[in-house]
Amino acid sequence: MGEASPPAPARRHLLVLLLLLSTLVIPSAAAPIHDADAQESSLGLTGLQSLLQGFSRLFLKGNLLRGIDSLFSAPMDFRGLPGNYHKEENQEHQLGNNTLSSHLQIDKMTDNKTGEVLISENVVASIQPAEGSFEGDLKVPRMEEKEALVPIQKATDSFHTELHPRVAFWIIKLPRRRSHQDALEGGHWLSEKRHRLQAIRDGLRKGTHKDVLEEGTESSSHSRLSPRKTHLLYILRPSRQL
């Protein structure tokens, strides 16, 4: 005789007990996954911070970093300027063997009909290494601060004027490094046999497709002389008040 199976109510109680146990086990098992996600996000922020610090050490080199902010103009009271104003100023600072140059341009234009005022402030800064230094082989990072044109409504009460924030950011042109393609062109990685095969292919193209050859030579010359892509780094600067 086989053993008797448990009655239906007992089976239902057993299933309910298993479901309760599963609800207790699943949250405890899912907790480490949440902690792992938080840990990965914190590692990502740490990596971004180290990347920015490495960039500063690589291109701004210590004492240059301390003198960069002096290139940008101090806050100016634009309301005290005339309705139409233009100013350009060039400055140079010597830091060690490097020369820091800045060009400041301020424009203020007033619409006599509407009373709106457009203000533009541009600062272009560059770092020029000394001649013969190792840094001279690289393109100098170019830093630019742009202040967006901000319309200011004509003030009806001189004692109650609103402050309008301005947008500012830095554009840093990253140094160009020699590409892998240029390095291969400078080496002797192509053999004589490959050169001969390429010459045969070019000769066949000349005999069969003259028009295609002309377009091909133009495209090949353009591809060889095509400029490299310029890489720019945009850094948002805290806005100032007018």
Curated annotation (Swiss-Prot):
Q: Where is carbohydrate linked to this protein?
A: N97, N112
A GO molecular function for this record? co-receptor binding
Where does it localize?
Answer: Secreted; Cytoplasmic vesicle, Secretory vesicle, Acrosome
Q: Which InterPro entries match?
A: DKK1-4 (IPR039863), DKKL1 (IPR049632)
Q: How would you describe the post-translational modification of this protein?
A: N-glycosylated during spermatogenesis. Not N-glycosylated in mature sperm.
| Signal peptide limits | 1-30
The alphabetical list of record keywords is:
Cytoplasmic vesicle, Glycoprotein, Secreted, Signal
Q: Does the keyword Glycoprotein apply?
A: yes
Could you give a single Gene Ontology term from the biological process aspect?
Answer: positive regulation of fat cell differentiation
- Please state, per the UniProt record, what induces or represses the expression of this protein: Abnormal expression in testes of patients with male infertility.
Tissue note: More highly expressed in adult testis than in fetal testis. Exclusively expressed in the testis (at protein level). Intense expression in stages II, III and IV of spermatogenesis, whereas expression is lower in stage I.
Its predominant location is secreted
Q: Name one GO cellular component term.
A: acrosomal vesicle
Q: How does it assemble?
A: Interacts with SLXL1; Co-localize in seminiferous tubules. Interacts with SLY.
Q: According to its UniProt entry, what is the function of this protein?
A: Involved in fertilization by facilitating sperm penetration of the zona pellucida. May promote spermatocyte apoptosis, thereby limiting sperm production. In adults, may reduce testosterone synthesis in Leydig cells. Is not essential either for development or fertility.
Q: What is known of its domains?
A: Contains a N-terminal domain similar to that of the N-terminal section of DKK3.
Q: What is this protein called?
A: Dickkopf-like protein 1
Question: Which species does the entry assign this protein to?
Answer: Homo sapiens (Human)
Q: What is the lineage of its organism?
A: Eukaryota, Metazoa, Chordata, Craniata, Vertebrata
Q: Gene that codes for this? A: DKKL1
